[in-house]
């Protein structure tokens, strides 16, 4: 694709265009402490195109011209390998290291957006739940989370479960363990990464964003309950 045509993919006056939304959302997430120190990432899939933030840049300073565009579908991007692009930024940037993991959300959940944060609440949850799953029940904010991230809304009476996978030195190497966790916990709306953060997806960017917010609230609440010696799952027997 010619450079001028490729740049047209990220040029729009529409504030809801993915190339405009991603910088706006990254600034918002930065203020929440989710993507500081260049960490974290976000992607938005619209039809046959995937818009992805760059890696290793200050997320609060991302501009639309920094956005990568990839075709979808394509073979799931493998860690540390080249992949097909519709557009690369002119400057020397690299696409998000989260890209293979974002593809998990597309291929396994048909998600329209996936968000990765380095939230301290998420990290603390992985430390206080040493097992393979985070659990919490009877919290109003559970109603803001959907079955599998893309299905029906959960109920106040449901017990929310989110799998926890072990971290790896390189982000891309989490791809397979994340996919395994998604298959083992098909009702989960995200995957926690121990001592690292969380991946959350949704049908579109709005649902991915609101579910990330709800889950972050639940991580914080769960951590506070654990530290106060309170059970996070009520026994109704």
Curated annotation (Swiss-Prot):
InterPro entries: Aldolase_II/adducin_N (IPR001303), Aldolase_II/adducin_N_sf (IPR036409), MethylthioRu-1-P_deHdtase_MtnB (IPR017714), Salvage_MtnB_euk (IPR027514). Pathway: Amino-acid biosynthesis; L-methionine biosynthesis via salvage pathway; L-methionine from S-methyl-5-thio-alpha-D-ribose 1-phosphate: step 2/6. It is found in: Cytoplasm. Its cofactor is Zn(2+). The active site is at 140 (proton donor/acceptor). GO terms for molecular function: methylthioribulose 1-phosphate dehydratase activity; zinc ion binding. Belongs to the aldolase class II family. MtnB subfamily. PANTHER family: METHYLTHIORIBULOSE-1-PHOSPHATE DEHYDRATASE. This is Methylthioribulose-1-phosphate dehydratase. The lineage of its organism: Eukaryota, Fungi, Dikarya, Basidiomycota, Agaricomycotina. The gene is MDE1.
């Amino acid at each position: 694709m010619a450079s001028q045509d490729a740049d047209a993919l990220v040029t729009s006056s529409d504030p809801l265009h993915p190339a405009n939304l991603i910088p706006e959302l990254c600034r918002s997430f930065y203020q929440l402490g989710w993507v500081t120190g260049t960490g974290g990432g976000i992607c938005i899939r619209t039809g046959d195109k995937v818009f992805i933030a760059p890696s290793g840049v200050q997320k609060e300073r991302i501009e639309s011209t920094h956005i990568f565009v990839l075709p979808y579908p394509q073979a799931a991007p493998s860690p540390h390998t080249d992949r097909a692009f519709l557009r690369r930024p002119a400057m020397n940037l690299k696409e998000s290291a989260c890209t293979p993991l974002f593809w998990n959300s597309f291929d396994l959940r048909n998600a329209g957006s996936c968000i990765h944060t380095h939230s301290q609440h998420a990290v603390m949850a992985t430390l206080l739940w040493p097992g393979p799953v985070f659990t919490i029940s009877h919290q109003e904010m559970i109603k803001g989370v959907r079955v599998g991230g893309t299905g029906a809304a959960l109920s106040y009476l449901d017990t929310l479960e989110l799998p926890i996978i072990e971290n790896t030195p390189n982000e891309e190497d989490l791809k397979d363990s994340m996919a395994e966790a998604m298959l083992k916990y098909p009702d989960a709306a995200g995957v926690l990464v121990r001592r690292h953060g969380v991946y959350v997806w949704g049908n579109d960017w709005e649902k991915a964003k609101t579910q990330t917010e709800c889950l972050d609230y639940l991580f914080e609440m769960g951590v506070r309950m654990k530290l106060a010696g309170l059970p996070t799952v009520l026994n109704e027997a």
